[in-house]
Each structure stands twice: as C-alpha cells, then as structure tokens.
Amino acid sequence: SRLTGVVADVRLLPGGGAMPVHHSQFFRPWRSDGAPRIQAQSCLGKGASEAQSCASALCVAVERYAAAWQGDEAMLLARAAELPAPAITPDMLSFFSAEQRASARPGERAAQRAYDPQTPQAWTPAWSLTENALRYLPLAACYADAPAPWADFAGWSSNGCASGNCREEAILQGLLEVIERDAVAIWWYNMISRPQARCAAAAQARAAQALGPD
C-alpha cells in the first residue's frame, strides 16, 4: 500500500560468513480476476558487505513485485500483423522443436504451444533500447503468472529482469545476469566438465572472498 510500501520484510540471515545474505519478502498484488495465489514471496540478496546484501535483497523484491501480472497492464489483443509496430513473437523467444513437443513425457514440464500467427495474442508495448523504437512483446513473456490462454504460447522468466538506482544501472544488471545465466547454461545443460576454481589463483580480493577458504 502507499503506507507500507512494497517490501514487507528484510533481514540478515545467520551463517553468511564472508558473504552476507539477506532475506526479503513481499506480498504479491491481488489479481483483477480474483484467482487464488500464494501471496507471500521470498527473495535473497548477497553482497560483499551487509549494506550491499541488504540493497540487493531489497531490489530483488521490488523487481519481482513489479513483474507480477495484475490485470491492469497496457496490452493489445490482436494478431502480430495487425499491430501498429513490429512484434517479438513467441517463436522468437522459445526455441522448442516439434520433436521436443511430441516427445514430452507425463510429469515433465510442458513446452509452450507452437505459435500460430493467425491466433490473436495479448501483446505488451515495450521500447527497444537497441532499435530506439516501439516494439510489442507477448504479455505472458513480460509478467509472471499471466493467465491462459496467453501463457500457453509464452512464459515469463526472471532471467534478465533487474532493478536499479537508475535506468542505466538496471540495464547493466539485467545484461550481466543474462550473460551469467547463459555462461552457466552452456556447461550445465551440456554436462561439460570444467576445472575447479582455486582461491589462491583469484586475482582480486573480492573473488577470493566469494570463493571462501575451501
């Protein structure tokens, strides 16, 4: 609310050692369709100091709150060809093949449905920083817990979402997170062996602090 703000709680977790970790909590906004949901959401933040860790946990909570779908977001319901500006279509964001969709087994996380250009979608207006122009994105790719049928074709992910003290800082944080997740995914999902990082070889004190004595 306007009185209590977005973040309900921020506290330092015990046992953080050289890298302090803060826990934050926020209450997700009520959906306009009245659908039930778990209201309390937890986040974590880390840093080289307690102040950095606290700020990180605070910003993550604000980021996740802002990403929650409420039902009052700006949107257009149309086919991509009918939009007043180019669209980033669901098939440009999700790279599932027909074979992957056909081979899904019961209990596995389902892939999004194949995008049909003739099916109207819910689109969110966005500003492209690379093109410096208006673009439209699938609403379900921009907000967490967007309802069906829009979420059948696209899904939200926190990867690349970031908040900051200014627009430039938020952009940098989001870019670095995408680079980080992409680098990890390359070796993790391909099960590629990688050498261990040795603390003694760390070039900076902060890297050594993050790695720890072991």
Residue positions per predicted region:
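Helix-coil modules at protein/domain termini and other flexible surface or pore-lining loops
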Residues: 1-214
